[in-house]
Regions:
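Ligand-binding pockets and gating/stacking loops
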Residues: 1-431
Length: 431
């Protein structure tokens, strides 16, 4: 059969096959838009990112300021951890028991106070520019390090995928695989099973037709949409055939007691799924949690919902990884795009404050039981060991053995550094 013998119906059937009827125009257009201690050996290291979108308040979490002046001081106090001299916010009692496993960076600093661009900066190491979208470090990791098996090297939970989490000019091959929300009832990842009434013989026939169509349309494709669709299609086929993938995503096989320990929340079950994925060889898993932009009603929301969810999930993840002997080869990062203002506003909230904020890094050969850097008494500014965003991203690449001085070619042929300069990897996290 050649292309000219296709009927309209045959062609539509091929189109439907690409994602078994689930690849819609919006997804196609999105792909089109995306197209323009003793450290472990880099090849053995995996990363789990707990991404707190909106801007976590450092006052109520990792950098409490009980001596801050009135109007700045949190309504919640600080508590000791299992490491002498280190305190965290009182809403993190479970995490406080594991301080020996993590480093608190209290001196992150940036100038970007806008959510979208600040997230893009924190997830790429590039200050955003209007003319160019930069790849996330998850996508760079997927490109630079070979997949360990048939599972995607970069997986994201809590979708939908934002543009700053994508591969940009590296191409759709390195976009994250979206695992949706594992806390949903009857959770199931799409594309892991054949649709009802479709067998492998039918799939193979349609796959042959699709390859034939691809050859023709690739000649007319100037923006990479065919490559994008083909990448998504081939990923789907690979996962459907993979028993490893089915096993990895089967979160319901976990003991009920363990699921409850992580917390029956999107963040908690996302962390549990991340552990399962890393256990099966996935290199980078991003667990996204939204709702951290507390301009209003900070103290009620962060005490009744957000920080208890984080505390439970993070502590359970560290304990689980440690008990399974995986913490040494799994780096866990608790990240956010910026901090919150020292001054409490009239709405009982805090506004955006990139000048001084906190991150946490655990495992992956990073020594625990310490803090890095410091802010002043009211957390207006960093007063000790400032760490800039590109410094932190360079550190991640260094841990993975990725050359962070290399140059890429953008989609318009322009040379682009993998990270904005100047930067310096954080040596305290490498030794």
């Amino acid at each position: 059969m050649d292309l000219h013998s296709f009927s309209r119906r045959s062609f539509l059937s091929v189109g439907a096959l690409t994602l078994f009827g689930r690849f819609r125009l919006g997804e196609a257009l999105a792909l089109r838009a995306a197209a323009p201690g003793s450290s472990p050996k880099p090849e053995n290291l995996s990363i789990i990112l707990l991404w707190l979108a909106g801007g976590l308040s450092q006052f109520e979490s990792w950098d409490p300021k009980p001596a801050a002046k009135e109007g700045y001081r949190s309504k919640f106090g600080s508590i000791p951890t299992n490491v002498t001299g280190i305190q965290v916010g009182e809403l993190l009692p479970l995490s406080a028991r594991h301080a020996d496993k993590y480093t608190i960076i209290r001196s992150m600093t940036s100038q970007d106070a806008v959510h979208e661009s600040a997230q893009a900066f924190m997830l790429s190491g590039h200050a955003p520019r209007s003319t160019l979208q930069f790849p996330s470090y998850g996508s760079v990791i997927a490109k630079e390090l070979s997949p360990r098996n048939e599972l995607p090297p970069y997986i994201l939970t809590g979708g939908p995928v934002r543009k700053w989490e994508q591969a940009a000019f590296l191409g759709p091959k390195y976009n994250p695989f979206l695992a949706d929300d594992p806390n949903k009832e009857n959770y199931k990842v799409r594309d892991l099973d054949l649709p009802l009434g479709v067998d492998w013989a039918r799939v193979d026939r349609r796959n042959s037709l699709l390859r034939l169509a691809d050859r023709q349309f690739r000649r007319m494709d100037t923006v990479g949409i065919v490559d994008a669709m083909d990448t998504h299609h081939q990923t789907a086929l690979t996962l459907i055939r993979s028993e490893r993938a089915k096993r990895a995503f089967k979160i319901e096989s976990e003991p009920e007691k363990l699921r409850e320990k992580y917390g029956r929340t999107s963040l908690g079950q996302g962390c549990l799924l991340a552990r399962r994925l890393v256990e099966e060889g996935v290199r980078f898993v991003s667990v996204r949690s939204g709702g951290w932009d507390h301009h209003f009603n900070l103290f009620n929301d962060i005490s009744t919902k957000k920080l208890p969810e984080l505390d439970r999930a993070f502590a359970a993840l560290l304990e689980d990884l440690n008990e399974r002997g995986m913490l040494g080869t799994t780096m866990v990062i608790v990240g956010t795009e910026f901090g919150r203002t020292p001054e409490i506003n009239v709405n009982d909230g805090r506004d955006h404050w990139p000048a001084a904020f906190s991150l946490v890094v655990a495992g992956g050969g990073v020594d625990g039981g310490r803090t890095l850097g410091a802010t002043d008494q009211n957390c207006w500014e960093v007063v000790e060991r400032p760490i800039h965003v590109p410094d932190f991203i360079a550190t991640i690449y260094a841990k993975l053995g990725i050359d962070y001085h290399q140059m890429y070619q953008s989609n318009v042929g322009r040379p682009v550094r993998v990270i904005d300069e100047p930067f310096e990897a954080v040596q305290e996290l490498l030794t």
